């Protein structure tokens, strides 16, 4: 199943503007008690930390005030896959360094239940970080069917500034359960409208 990593995704000016805006003290962030809450983890194998989030697009509806910040990312994705892309969801996630540190990962999940075949998930990293994104071999069309005790790791993506990882949305993934320093990523869900060049 399709999985790619692209480095040096966007130009330096766009990257600097995005970083400066998201790290600005007046940028609006919204608190979520858990980063993932739709997956059953009865055996307590994972830990879903609190997260601050800012939404750029939800269910195809774009926030016109700040969406322009991530347009260079989407334009570069379209160029890489040689197809127009149609945004579904896009948000920034901010994990803060916490007194609660754990080796556990965040709860494995997919971003969209019942997603169509042409739907993809991507994570764009704004800065270097030690804590990886974990990509699993398993796929699903619903978070409610994930058996977290039976997952096997396909790869770990180390966050590097201006790096993008992309895969088909049914592939299960997870973030770190805690971080040593503030970690911001842009999470994107979108449709690729022409699959001819997807391998």
Regions found by a protein language model. Give the residues of each.
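Non-heme Fe(II)/2-oxoglutarate
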Residues: 1-84
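Catalytic core of non-heme Fe(II) oxygenases with the double-stranded beta-helix
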Residues: 67, 71-199
